[in-house]
Each structure stands twice: as structure tokens, then as C-alpha cells.
Amino acid sequence: MIHEGQLEVFDLTLIAKAPVFIGSGKSYVKKEYVFLTPRFARVSCDEVMLLDETKFFHLLLERKLEDKYTQFMLGAQTDLYRFLTAECCLSLNDIRAVSRYSIAAADALDAGHSLKEINAFVRGADGRVYVPGSSVKGALRTAILTDWILSDNSPHSAFGDTRKGFPEGTYLHTLKLKKDRNGAVLDDAVNSILRGLSISDSLPVSDTCMILAGKIDADPDGQTHRINLCRECIRPGTALHFKLTLDQSVLHQKITAESLMNSVRTFDSFYEKAYLRHFIAPRHAAEISYDSTLFLGGGVGFFSKTLTYPYLGEKDGLQAAINELNRSFRKHRHEEDRADGISPRTIKYALYEGELYPYGLCEVKLS
């Protein structure tokens, strides 16, 4: 830790215990990436290669292949590698020369050409993967508020019925920076105590630490359902490095390094007690310890992103969650969740090296 006046600067390390996905909003359809397998290419494992559009089109023009490529894009064939090698007579080295990056396909695609659209991970202007500090702060916010709510014995209103959302101002908007014309402190994000907590973006993540991962939903009885979805993810075991700064001129010791870690552990305990206990571990589930962990990024599920259950308790939280999910996903029959005692009634898993991992789980270390 470094002290700079009222600032306390810590090294924050998140170790991916499962595939982590933070989407850029971009995606690649089947005809926009090259799928390589050891059977057909000189690679050690299944691999996906993303092309640099500018370099690729220069190559097509140089080899006078633009008409063939147009026919390919309009036709039924979807295997870009086979098209480029068999019909365009390009070598693997030719293709690599116009690629942006390659990542391991892992368990997400197979040699049977079950090609899927790939959701891309966020990258910086230099093309390298990174984790935005705002994503980590959002995960810590959930842990902090879960801890504070569970420590608050005052009665809580059923916000799930009013549709007004969680009253975070009660817990967070405690500063006096913005007031109305009468001098009353406003319930406004400008007054959030979390202004005193900042997290840098992560150091860049190498493409060798990236994999493709699909999505598998698991029911309370352990039954699984594969979803036709594919994401660029950070590989389990990867360490992500950030700087976390606490401004005690704002926080006044309300949030400290010790209290942050306590909040993380409180969230873990509540997650296991209120949510995970309703589920039988599916077949091939990896052995996971929920100790000093956070759920980071996309695809981690409703419970990890919301405060419905800690605020309302399990009984009222169940009904509020059903109401909220019914409004957002009318076709999913969330009224049936009541019979399972939990809503939503699925846990989101990623398949990696033959085992199922809960999406986004990261171990937290502060030093």
C-alpha cells in the first residue's frame, strides 16, 4: 500500500477462477473468423483467428479474389478457412499475415463445424484485452451494499412491487456535495460515497490468456442446457492487475481495505446461503471455493448483479425477483420459479477443459 496524503493506493489482483467475459458490443459471425483444427492446419489445438479487415481486403484485391469472396459471403458455405485455402489457394502463413489475433477455441467449437457467432471481449485502442476498472467497481459495489444491507436491521420496503428500484441513496448518497435550492441534500449520484473509491483499468491481458467459452444453464436439479452462444473469455488461472485507490477525505474510514475484504466475504457467504443451496451441482461441475470471490463481467446471472434478495430477504425477494423477471422476459414463465424456491432458477456455467465453471468468478487479493 502507498499513502499519499488522504489517498491509500493498493495493488488489487483478481485471479480468474472461471472464464470471465466483458463484452465490447462487437460480434463475429461464422464467415468473419477462421477456425483452425490440428486435423486441417498446423496448429496444436483448435484455434480461432480474427482477421484485420483492412489487411485482409488488401490481400483479396492483390490476389484478385474479391469476386470469389463476394460469392462466398452470399453463399451457403460458412467455413472461411476451407474457402481461403481450397478455393483461393492461400496458405496458412498468408492468412496469419492478415490476422489481428488468435485465441484458443477450447470447448466452445468443434471439428464438426458447429460454428457460432462469437461475442468479442473489450479491447483498448491498441487492440489488447483489458478489464475496465468500472466493471470491477460495479462488482465491489454489489458486495459493499450487500454487506451494509445485511447489517441494517431497519424495515425495508418492497421495491420490487413499486418498480422504483433499489433505494441505493439511503446507503450511498451520504455526501453533501449537491443540494437543492432550499439547501437540502439531494438523493443524487453526485453525493455517492463511492466517489472515494476508484479502480484503474487492468494491465493488458495477453491473447494467450484468452479462450472461447460457451454457455450452459443448470437447473436446481442439476440438469443442464447448452445455449447456442460463444464468448471470448479470460482463461481460468489468469491474474488481473489493478490499482485501487481509497480517498479517505471522502470516505472517512467508512470504507477501508479491511472492510472491503469483509464485504466480499459477506457477499460470498450470502450467495452460498441464499442462492447456491437451492441447486444440485451439475455433472462435471468444477470444485470451486467461494472464499474472497466476486462475480465479474457479463453472463454471471441476476443474483450476482442485483440487491433484491439481501434487501428484501429470501421470501419477499423471491416474489420481487419473479415480478422483475416477468416484466423483462415474459416468455420464460418465471412464475414457475416459486416451486423451486429461487428465481431465476438457473446458474450460468461455462465449459472449460471438460468441467463446468460459474461464469465470472474471481478471487480477490488486496495488498
Where are these regions (language model features)?
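Basic, Gly/Ser/Thr-rich N-terminal segments that form RNA-phosphate-binding interfaces in CRISPR RAMP
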Residues: 1-367
